[in-house]
Amino acid sequence: AEADLLVHDLSPDAADLVGLHEDDLAQRHPSLVTVSVTPFGRSGPYSKWCAEDLQLIHGGGWGWMTPGCSDEIDLPPLKPAGQQAGFQIGFAAATIALGALDRSLCTGEGEHLDLAGMAYISSMLEAGFISWSYLNEIPGRAGTRILNPWRIFEVADGRIFIVCVEDDQWARLKEVMGSPEWAQM
């Protein structure tokens, strides 16, 4: 059997037990790209710890920021709907895996990528780092109030979540709303 890419979510001990340690794989299959997706990475003080979506969301800081789409900043830390940590970490794993695979197919050299889920979730804290760097705005529980629509809005029949970060998205949203005068710049 042959493969160019291996992605797994086994704990470091489980991966070693079934022969998927990155050093052994690199020696046997030098062009293979491997991606380990674990809660805390394959090394470090928490590498053997388990975690689920809820722990990753709150450990990564996202839970504290959850009222960011609401005006009710006194709400307790919340969990986003669904399995958001898993979705986001999976998307990151796919992205880095395909990038490394493309490089490997060009060079013939494999590599191992270690994706720590909590570190990735921490990197997503809204636009906090950007807002602090460029606007000198310190993010708080109310989220980062950036210049584009990115929140839950009250509407006539309930609520709607709108994210328009690109000019063409804003243009289409204005069109859907009937091009109100207040939305013209």
Model features per residue range: what roles?
Residues 1-109, 135:
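N-terminal helix-loop segment corresponding to the beta1-alpha1 unit
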Residues 39-41, 54, 117-122, 157-159, ...:
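Glycine-rich beta-alpha junction loops
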Residues 77-88, 110-112, 140-144, 148-150, ...:
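A short glycine-threonine-serine/GTX helix/turn-capping micro-motif
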Residues 148-185:
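Aromatic-enriched alpha-helical interface/lid elements that frame and gate functional surfaces
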